[in-house]
């Protein structure tokens, strides 16, 4: 997403055939641009969140 920086990306093939990607980073607070933020089941404190937005941008670009 805009302004968000991801270290660990995962490519997911969309139904239309084009690649989309999702950030696998576990963060203490989601970036404001993230619209689908979910708390993860981790033993860490504070809690970790993952942004589940599907971003059509190339994961290699910051």
UniProtKB/Swiss-Prot annotation:
S-S bridge residues: 5-59, 6-23, 13-21, 30-37, 34-51
SUPFAM superfamilies referenced in this protein's UniProt entry, alphabetically: Bowman-Birk inhibitor, BBI
InterPro entries, per database record: Bowman-Birk_prot_inh, Prot_inh_BBI
GO cellular component: a single term: extracellular region
GO terms under biological process: negative regulation of endopeptidase activity
Record-marked site positions (Reactive bond for trypsin): 15-16
Keyword Transport assigned: no
Keyword Disulfide bond recorded: yes
Tissue note: Expressed in bulb (at protein level).
GO molecular-function terms, A-Z: serine-type endopeptidase inhibitor activity
Keywords associated with the record: Disulfide bond, Protease inhibitor, Serine protease inhibitor
Protein task: Serine protease inhibitor. Inhibits trypsin (Ki = 65 nM) and weakly inhibits chymotrypsin (Ki = 295 nM). Does not inhibit bacterial subtilisin.
Family label: Belongs to the Bowman-Birk serine protease inhibitor family.
Protein name according to UniProt: Bowman-Birk type proteinase inhibitor B7
